[in-house]
Swiss-Prot record:
It comes from the Eukaryota. One of its GO terms (molecular function) is phospholipase A2 activity. This is Protein PROCA1. It comes from Homo sapiens. Pfam families: Phospholip_A2_2 (PF05826). CDD domains: PLA2_group_III_like.
Length: 364
């Protein structure tokens, strides 16, 4: 304890004995010399009745200082880290501001040089969200056993995720990228008829290229161009293989369905009946039927064999008649032959009938 007191006394005496030029005077301090992320904390203690023009009257950071002053007027709308406010509990390592205050700060830091350090870190690296207040009814009082006793409209914070914000540093980076692109030499591309190379050693052994055929050279600026082309080819191959597999599966399913349908139709279809023998009663006459009924079974078999033989002969004759009917010339010849053969017989008969009776010599 005694050591601590002596140390504190020594430090206090040293600070008091220092010259006045080196002492830090609050009246002569300039807000512009402080880093941009510390200004808000220092300006928070200043009364709101003071004029903004009194702070940072000159310098590059005039506009950001004014913006910080306006922004610190929103002190009532800040949710501090790991604190609960507006029915929300903040789990962020940084404070969450109201969206109106946040947008004002970003707009004022766009055209200023001081936004190069604070702007990108706050908007892109940290990605601090903002919130808006909406009135909702929430329970205010509770009973001892936990149920709500009374409700009241309370402003509830609705968190909004941050959007990409363009700062002065982004504009500088874009300008640098444009200058680098302009300084790069253009990539040579040849479109049109190819000229023959003067070196004969470099020519192909198979033959010289056609000079009339246009040649287009495609070059990818990115180093991963070849890998992307191979990936695309692999994807196309995989798609084709999948389509083939699907087609094979569909064909197999169709064959299975057809086999099942065939089995069902076989089960449902009735048994094929044997063709019934021709009715003998229709082909036979009444007399033959009577004979068959009276005669023995052996005689019936003989009669049936005779009838079948006669039927075959009739069938053969009918086929011959069909052949004759197919040829009209033969038919006419046969008709004429029949007519010529019938006429002399009729004439003979007529002569026999018309011949007068022979005269008897006795009567004369």
């Amino acid at each position: 304890m005694w050591v601590r007191t002596t140390l504190t006394i020594e430090r206090w005496t040293k600070e008091k004995t220092e010259p006045k030029a080196r002492s830090w005077d609050e009246a002569l301090s300039d807000v512009n010399r402080l880093p941009s992320w510390e200004r808000g904390h220092l300006l928070a203690g200043v009364a709101s009745s003071t004029d903004v023009s009194t702070f940072s009257e000159g310098g590059d950071c005039k506009e950001p200082d004014k913006c910080c002053w306006r922004h610190k007027q929103c002190t009532g709308h800040i949710i501090y880290p790991f604190a609960s406010d507006c029915v929300r509990h903040s789990l962020h390592l940084h404070s969450v501001n109201h969206c109106n205050c946040n947008s004002r700060l970003k707009d004022s830091s766009e055209d200023s040089s001081s936004s190069r350090g604070a702007g990108p870190t706050c908007s892109h690296v940290i990605e601090s969200p903002c919130f808006e207040l909406t009135p909702e009814e929430e329970h205010v009082e509770r009973f001892r056993y936990g149920w709500c006793k009374s409700y009241r409209p309370v402003s509830v914070a609705v968190i909004h995720h941050p959007l990409y914000h363009e700062c002065g540093a982004d504009d500088l980076n874009e300008e640098e990228e444009e200058e680098e692109e302009e300084s790069k030499p253009p990539i040579p591309t040849q479109v049109g008829p190819a000229t023959a190379s003067p070196d004969l050693g470099t020519s192909m052994a198979t033959g010289t290229p056609d000079s009339t055929a246009p040649i287009t050279i495609w070059r990818s600026e990115s180093p991963t161009g070849k890998g992307q082309g191979s990936k695309v080819i692999k994807k196309v191959k995989k798609k084709k293989e999948k389509e083939k597999d699907k087609e094979e599966m569909d064909e197999k399913a169709k064959l299975k369905k057809k086999a099942k349908k065939g089995q069902l139709t076989k089960k449902k279809s009735p048994v094929k009946l044997e063709p019934s023998p021709p009715d003998v009663s229709r082909s036979l006459s009444a007399r033959q039927l009577a004979r068959m009924s009276e005669s023995s079974p052996e005689s019936r078999e003989e009669l049936e064999s005779e009838d079948s033989y006669n039927g075959r002969g009739q069938g053969e004759l009918s086929s011959e008649d069909i052949v004759e009917s197919s040829s009209p010339r033969k038919r006419e010849n046969t008709v004429q032959a029949k007519k010529t053969g019938a006429k002399p017989s009729q004439a003979r008969k007529v002569n026999k009938r018309k011949s007068p009776p022979g005269s008897n010599p006795n009567l004369s």
